Curated annotation (Swiss-Prot):
It comes from the Eukaryota. Keywords: Cytoplasm, GTPase activation. It comes from Saccharomyces cerevisiae (strain ATCC 204508 / S288c). This is GTPase-activating protein MSB4. Changing R200K: Reduced GAP activity. InterPro entries: Rab-GAP-TBC_dom, Rab-GAP_TBC_sf, Rab_GAP_TBC_domain. The gene is MSB4.
Length: 492
């Protein structure tokens, strides 16, 4: 599976003629390709340089795009190289194009360094898509964190995640699962949920749209359905869970269908265990671990979490001071209403696509602890907006009076008390900051170079071993809480 060379150019990714010829009559053979394969031109015998070939392909693809513009979209330049709309609610197309002009140069420089790095390690490039990578070293980690070339990502993710080992141990399983699905093995509940979510997957991506000239569904939608249904049969403990459609949808842009299936198995079983089960307890455990990390690494935000724990209905009269014991692990703070979805989606839709893909590079190379680093990095970058919110300023002043022993007779205290919102209203204001801030992180380097790649940043102390220990601790704490809250049996 080879991604088209045009994918690394500034040109928007647009269909070529072969796609139009085959889309309407696609069958299960499309399972052997990723969407990117469908845009690959066959230029056997072309001995021109990589740069020259890119320029030729770019011109050719743009000319083809112009011929079919009236059929498929208003302007192909409105879409990025993966088929996503450049324009969003928080980012204009002008902002995107200005950023991309410079970032594209960055990716080209990085790719040349990758090529030299692999050749130095005696690894062949295999038609500009390496199949293997060097042993894990600090140097390789730096390369991954600075971004894997877009056209290499499918094979790189597969290699780093151990996908081939998973496939080799389960030869023929995916085909059998598809056969079982055709025989009615998918539960009615899962089937209904999957069908409902298919066309909700990346509504701003051209590959997931059914165009008027197509007789059937887009190939990627059919692949998405098969993978999700097969997984619901493969792991009945999980079945289908919302957000899986986005995980698989993104994987299908970079790899063939069966590989996308096994990558989903790896994500749900290895990287985020228990997160997608029906009770979502694994998701709650991970949020508890995140709260522990906030307590250790982000004291200003932790101070807000402490002050927000109350004994009653949210009245500001009932602020109780620092959260006691393990309460915050069992009654998770409000901000986890946002951050839980960050983990379940692996940041798909949380940050712009280039930033998402850089996060995925590191997820598959470094495992799930990197998701915690990213979450903390986003919170750190948004900290100033978080703390500058009007309600936070008032709460800090109010808390200083409350814990300082002031009473209702204090005139300043009374004025603050009248101005301040309820804790629920304050939390909603904070949630809006946390929800909106990451959507502006168009440039991956804004979080990677400013926070995640700095040598002296405390977040470097977060390892996979530390996260796994945290998961065990939080799970036990939550189990203790549940056990203590059960009514005791009466003695006979």
């Amino acid at each position: 599976m080879i991604m088209s060379s045009t994918m690394s150019t500034e040109a928007a990714l647009v269909p070529n003629e072969s796609v139009f010829d085959t889309v309407s009559s696609f069958n299960e053979d499309d399972a052997n390709y990723s969407v990117l394969d469908l845009y690959d031109d066959d230029d056997e015998g072309d001995d021109s340089s990589t740069v020259e070939r890119k320029e030729i392909l770019t011109t050719r693809e743009l000319e083809k795009a112009k011929a079919f513009t009236s059929l498929i979209m208003a302007d192909p330049e409105n879409f990025d190289r993966y088929g996503f709309s450049k324009k969003g609610y928080f980012i204009s197309q002008e902002e995107y194009d200005k950023w991309w002009t410079e970032y594209n140069r960055y990716t080209e420089r990085r790719k040349k360094k990758w090529e030299n790095f692999l050749l130095k390690n005696k690894i062949e490039l295999h038609n500009d898509n390496p199949l293997v990578y060097p042993a894990r070293t600090d140097e390789l980690s730096k390369f991954v964190r600075k971004g894997i070339p877009a056209e290499w990502r499918g094979n790189a993710w597969w290699y780093f995640a151990g996908g081939q080992r998973q496939l080799d141990a389960n030869v023929g399983v995916y085909d059998r699962l598809k056969s079982d699905c055709r025989e009615g093995a998918v539960s009615g509940k899962d089937m209904e949920a999957i069908e409902r979510d298919l066309y909700r997957t990346f509504p701003d991506n051209i590959h997931f749209h059914k165009e008027s000239f197509q007789n059937g569904e887009p190939a990627i939608i059919r692949s998405l359905r098969r993978v999700l249904m097969a997984f619901s049969v493969y792991d009945k403990t999980i079945g289908y869970c919302q957000s899986m459609n986005f995980l698989v949808g993104l994987l299908l842009l970079f790899m063939e269908e069966e590989k996308a299936f096994w990558m989903l198995v790896i994500i749900t079983g290895k990287y985020l265990p228990g997160v997608y089960e029906s009770d979502l307890e694994g998701a709650n455990v991970d949020q508890g671990v995140l709260v522990l990390c906030i307590k250790e690494y982000l004291p200003e935000i932790w101070s807000h979490i402490e002050s927000s724990y109350m004994n009653g209905n949210g009245s500001t009269d009932q602020i109780s001071g620092p959260a006691s014991g393990e309460e915050y692990l069992c009654r998770l703070p409000t901000l986890t209403l946002c951050t839980a979805s960050w983990f379940m989606s692996c940041f798909v839709g949380v940050v712009p696509i280039e930033t998402t893909l850089r996060i995925w590079d590191c997820l598959f190379y470094e495992e799930s602890h990197f998701l915690f680093k990213v979450a903390l990095g986003i919170l750190k970058l948004s900290e100033s907006e978080f703390l500058e919110s009007k309600s936070q300023k008032l709460f800090r002043q109010y808390s200083s009076y409350t814990f300082g022993g002031s009473n209702d007779s204090d005139s300043t205290f009374k004025r603050l008390k009248n101005k301040i919102k309820t804790q629920e209203e304050a939390d909603m204001e904070i949630l809006q900051v946390i929800q909106n801030f990451p959507k502006r992180l168009l440039n991956p380097n804004d979080i990677f170079e400013k926070v995640l790649m700095k040598k002296k940043v405390a977040l470097n102390g977060i390892t996979q071993e530390k996260i796994d220990r945290g998961r065990e601790y939080v799970a036990m704490a939550r189990n203790r809480q549940r056990a203590s809250s059960r009514p005791k049996e009466r003695r006979k």
